[in-house]
Amino acid sequence: MQTDTNICLNCGAGSARDARLCANCAAPLVLDSKGSVAVWRLGEVRPEVLDGIARMIGKSLGLPVVVQPALLDPRPSRRPDWRGASATAFLNQVDRRAGSGKGRGTVFSLGITEENIVPGSAWNYLFGYAYLGQPSCVVTLHQMSSDSPSLRHLVRRAATIAIHEIGHNCGLDHHGYDEGIACVMTADTELDCLERLDEGTHRFCRACQLVVDRKLAGLRS
């Protein structure tokens, strides 16, 4: 029995990951995302938040953003004894979809969820998670929604984290806070919090932007 299906938002049925249409109701599940940022959802995500994040990412990277109609199967990432879903399992689900079927040619694959995600049982929360130099990353709205921000504020937070994680996909590492660089890649896992996130920027510094531009140029060639 397959345990990582795509879930139809229309009828709730599961279908194979490479199925374009729902096996039960024929609703679309996977759209062509070649040359785009593909967005996958683990559970339902507020449409107005999702739309705002997609707009900011598209503007930052100069790429179209395709929100896939299907939801990710929640079973692989469930960890009943943890404080959230497994960030690694969630990321692996997104990564598996990046290179198969309609996902072939996707520039980056981004997972978004309203659930809390953690990399292990000792963790309380994450903002995002990524593979360095690989084309997949995930973002959670859970912690950044904890102080009931406005829609605009939440979208900015989430888009900032998404752009940061895509920076890791491009091979970028962190700047330290002590460097005083205004860049979306400024971070420290021991210091990161909502206050730090709100003080930062969603833009790359000049040096990081050059790396991202070279990466995108290579992918387009």
Where are these regions (language model features)?
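Short functional micro-motifs and their immediate structural scaffolds
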Residues: 14-16, 30, 175, 213
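Short metal-coordination and nucleic-acid-contact micro-motifs, chiefly zinc-binding Cys/His arrays
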Residues: 4, 18, 163, 201
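Cys/His-coordinated zinc-binding microdomains
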Residues: 12, 26, 206-209
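The −1 position to Zn-ligating cysteines in a subset of zinc-ribbon hairpins
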Residues: 7, 14, 21, 184, ...
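Metzincin-family zinc-dependent endopeptidase catalytic domain
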Residues: 44-161, 173
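Short Cys/His-rich micro-motifs in 6-15 aa windows
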Residues: 25-32
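Fold-level signature of zinc-dependent metallopeptidase catalytic domains
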Residues: 32-46
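Metalloprotease/metallohydrolase-associated module, dominated by Zn2+-dependent proteases
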Residues: 127-157, 173-221
